[in-house]
Structures are given as structure tokens and as C-alpha cells.
Amino acid sequence: MSLPRGGVALLGCTAGIALANNYAVQPALGDIARDTGTSTAAIGLVTTAALAGCIAGFAFLLPLVDRAAPRRLVTGQLLLLTAGLLLAASARGLGPLLVAYVVVGAGASVSAMASAIAGRGVPGERRGAAVGLVAAGMSAGILLSRLIGGALADAVGWRGMLLVSAGLVLACAGGAWWRLPDERPAPRGGYLATLAELPGLLRRYRALRRAVVQGSLWYFAFSLVWVALTVRLAQPPYGLDAAAIGLYSLAGALGFAALPVAGRLGDRYSPRAVICVSMAVAAVGAGVLCAGLGRPVLTGVGLALLDAGCFTAQAANQARILGVDPRRGGSLSGVYLLLYFCAGAVGSAVAAPLVSRGGWGAASLVVLGALVLAGGLALGWRDASASAVPGGRSAGAARWGFARSSPRP
């Protein structure tokens, strides 16, 4: 299977727009609670429902990448996402809204499909750049969704915001049907057999286990720092409202600008080298944040560095996973992202209690510790290919993963 010209860019836009729907509703949760007669405490379950749907999508839908044609698979899942958004826009109570957001979350998992399809649909020596471009779209969707969602909800109401989102997703579905290939991969066994082998992939592939551990550490840190930031800035002496806090996401959004470059570096050097450097950058950002939140410019610099490091490491990690066995790219990505997002959920869950008990200092130190541990593991866990010394580079460069990658067939 080969992607047409512009196919990777289309997948990147699709991934960003789809994944944004898991987060865009969050600034409007107060309005939704009032309109549906739901308590403030209960309305937070909408976010949980979206996450549950997304995790289910990773587990049960993402392995279909190894079995179905990209055109039909991506289009079908985008139509599922559109249906979930329309159902949410028409919901009159909490129950229908939660059902709708489970569907929305499952549909939004198409973002991970886009990454796997992009990695499979280009030559091996361009895999990192392709995955990096899709990761940039996903990161932009996550970081800008709350800002844009809040602005749309203010302008046209939360139901109108969901209808606009549904229209954008439907446009992506049309683009996917028009541009993505209709070539079906050769399946290996039945669908249920594919699901049954998912736990065994962790036992079989050491590279997958390492990717899961490292990725879980930095996504735990990423999720923790953003929730902790929101909680702390809403408290005295800052007392910022949701709109003002949302502006900090613009600083974090600077980080995804590094992703396309990082993807190309991942094709030139080993993923391990990119991850080591990325974690060093993220740890510097976390160290800046440890200084406190009293200076907004310094906080913005810390967030930008932390996000750039985490996003770049994620692109390299996903490219490494897809390179383990491209024929099982969907299944491998499904296992990885399932555990990756579970780690993020843990980070989000512990953020508020950590801030309330230990303050911002405790939260930022935990973030720094997780990033340093992820970087230390990347240094200690040598890639299997590191012993090769392609292109005449020194053995020392190969040992640390900075030897140029050999072109893949």
C-alpha cells in the first residue's frame, strides 16, 4: 500500500480534528450542566466517557488497520464520530450525553489509525517524518481544542459548537474517501484471533515493552502537569478564569512545531537517540516549572520545552513501534496506546490531590522525576541495532544511538 501525494497531510489534519473532539467540550461543561440539569460534579463524567470510548477504540478498532482498507476504515470511523457528535448535540440529559461521548471517544481513536496508516504507507526511510507529521496534527488537536472549543461555545453555544465539529469531521470523511487507498492488507487470522493475540505482543516484543514503559512515563508527566497547572492557577493568589488558563495552551502548542523536524531526525538517527535528547529537553522544561508560576513568561517557556520534548519522543516511539513489524502496525499501536492513555489517566487523576497536599512544587517535582526516569531508561536500554555502525560512523556514536540509520527496504 502506498499513500498518494498529500495523503500524510490529510491523515495529520484528520487526526487532529478527530482527537480534538475529546477535549473541545471541556470549557463548556458548566454551560452543559446548567442546560441539562446536571450537577457540577456529575458533568465531569463526560470527560471520563470520552476517555473510556477512546481506550475501547484503541483496543477493539485500531487492530482493524491490519485487516481493512484505509479508505473504508477511516471513513467509517469518521462517520461514527459524526454520529456521536450529533447525538451529543441533541442530548437533553446526562445519560444520553455519556453514551454519545463514549461513541465520540471511540470515533476519535481514528487518530491512532491515521498514524499507523501513515507509517505503513510510506517507504521505511520516511516513516519517522510521516508519523511525526501525523503526531503534529494530534498534538495541535489536543492543545488547541480547549481554546477553540471555548471560543466556539461562547459564540454559538455548546450545541452549535458540536454541530460545527460534526461538519468538520464529515469534511474529513469526504477527504478520506476521496484520497486514501482502497487496498486491503492481507489479514493474518480472524478478527477475534487478532484481539486474542494482543496481550501476547507484549511478551513477544521487547521493543514494545520498552516503548510502553517509557511512553507511559512521559504521558503520565504530561497529563499531570496540565491538570495540576489548571487547578493551581484557579486558586489564590492567581485566581485565573478558564479563558485565561486556556491561553497557557498556546505556549504548549509551540512544542508541536518541532514534530516534523523530529520525525526527519528519527529517520536519520535512531529513535533511542531522539528520545534521549527529547527527554533532556522536557526535563529542562520541568525544571523551569519547578521555579513556580509567578512569572507567566517563564512558565510559558517551561511548558513549551516540556511539550516539545514529550511530543518529539512520542513521534520517535511510535515510529519505532511501527518498525517492529509493519504488518502488525495496528495491533502493536493498539497495545501501546491503550497502556499509554491509561498512564495519562493516572496522571490526570493524581494531579489535583497532589496539588492540594503538596502544592505546585510537589506536582512539578513528580513530573521532573518521571521525565528523568524515562530518559534514564532510554539511555540504559540499548537498541538492538545500536551495535551496527552504518555509514562508517564510530562505534561510540552507534553505542549511544547517534549513528545514522541505514535506509530500510
Task: Give names to the regions the model predicted.
Residues 57-69, 258-271, 355:
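Helix-to-loop junctions at the C-terminal end of transmembrane segments
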Residues 272-315:
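C-terminal transmembrane helical hairpin of 12-TM major facilitator-type secondary transporters
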Residues 71-74, 97, 275:
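Primarily marks hydrophobic transmembrane alpha-helices of the MFS/SLC 12-helix fold
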Residues 181-213, 403:
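Juxtamembrane intracellular "pre-TM" segments in multi-pass secondary transporters
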